[in-house]
Regions:
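Switch I (effector-binding) loop of TRAFAC-class P-loop GTPase G-domains
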Residues: 18-47
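Conserved P-loop small GTPase signature centered on TRAFAC-class small GTPases
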Residues: 1-11, 15-18, 40-45, 86, ...
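WD40-repeat beta-propellers
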Residues: 49-51, 84, 91
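Conserved beta-strand segments of the P-loop GTPase G domain that flank and frequently precede/overlap
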Residues: 50-51, 74-78, 105-109
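Inter-motif core of Ras-like GTPase G domains
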Residues: 59-81, 88, 94-98
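The beta1-alpha1 cofactor-binding region of Rossmann-like NAD(H)/NADP(H)-dependent oxidoreductases
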Residues: 53-56, 82, 143
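Eukaryotic intrinsically disordered and solvent-exposed regulatory patches
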Residues: 23-25, 34-37, 60-61, 92-93, ...
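Switch II (G3) loop of P-loop NTPases
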Residues: 45-60
């Protein structure tokens, strides 16, 4: 599940990962979006289900439905917006309270506008280590850093390396939970 404040670039990151596309003309996500992405790990193809949650306050009550059974949460912030970075702590707490086994990756978006940076890599790395997470810095606009961050996250957190089996499991409602 992708989580983060409004306008940090969650949907743009997903579009770059899945379609290798970016549009400056993007409308905010309403409610939640759904995508599938196939990731190759150890010569196996893993199907991930990606839930793109809206960051607007009026939709925040919907998010727990999607991270309750998630295997992983991708917490996105805007490196040019310090407030969006400080909110990552609340996102991690909310997910951890509902789903203690959920794994995290912290993603700083908008690396293409370095001159407007408000959050240092060192600060983001430090916070990610507090969550036992990895930190990735990307630009959905240019594609910088996009090549490996989801594959690394899936490899590190969602694949049982001893048996090389998917950890994505069916919940009681028959739907799979994932990113």
């Amino acid at each position: 599940v992708f989580l983060g404040d409004m306008a940090v670039g969650k949907t743009s990151i997903i579009n770059r990962c899945i379609r290798n596309a970016f549009s400056d003309l993007h409308t905010p996500t309403v409610g939640v979006g759904y995508e599938q992405m196939y990731v190759k790990v150890n010569e196996k193809t893993i199907r991930t289900e990606i839930w793109d949650t809206a960051g607007q306050e009026k939709y925040l009550s919907l998010a727990p439905m999607y991270y309750k059974n998630a295997q992983g949460a991708i917490i996105v912030f805007d490196i040019t917006n310090y407030h969006s970075f400080t909110r990552t702590k609340q996102w991690v707490k909310q997910v951890s309270d509902e789903n203690p086994s959920c794994k995290f990756i912290l993603v700083g978006n908008k690396a293409d506008i370095e001159q407007q940076r408000e959050v240092t890599k060192q600060l983001a790395d430090k916070l990610a280590s507090e969550y036992n997470a990895i930190y990735a810095e990307v630009s959905a606009k240019t594609g910088e850093g996009m090549d490996n961050f989801i594959q690394n996250f899936v490899t590190r957190n969602l694949v049982d390396t001893e048996t090389n089996k998917k950890l994505i499991s069916f919940g009681s409602n028959g739907r799979k939970g994932c990113c």
